[in-house]
């Protein structure tokens, strides 16, 4: 369960606060589940959200951080292309 207003993801009984930039990545990937979003598109979305240049390595660091928080099974890598959210998404409320 994801609370889009407070950047909190509930995984089982655990509530996990997701930093804003990482949450931007998660919500972007969840908008098109099971479809690859290119690295360059994700960098673009982050740059638009934060109004400054984002280095490619910064994206890699955020993806690694998300995987540490949630587990490897949620975000998958499409090698040399980008990433995709590997779970079905249902919006409630």
Question: Can you annotate each of these PLM segments?
Answer:
Residues 1-24, 84-93:
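A structural micro-motif at secondary-structure boundaries
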Residues 4, 32, 80:
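A conserved catalytic-core signature of glycosyltransferases
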Residues 13-18, 24-61, 68, 73:
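Positively charged, aromatic-enriched patches within helix-turn-helix-type DNA-binding elements
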Residues 77-85:
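A beta-hairpin/wing motif
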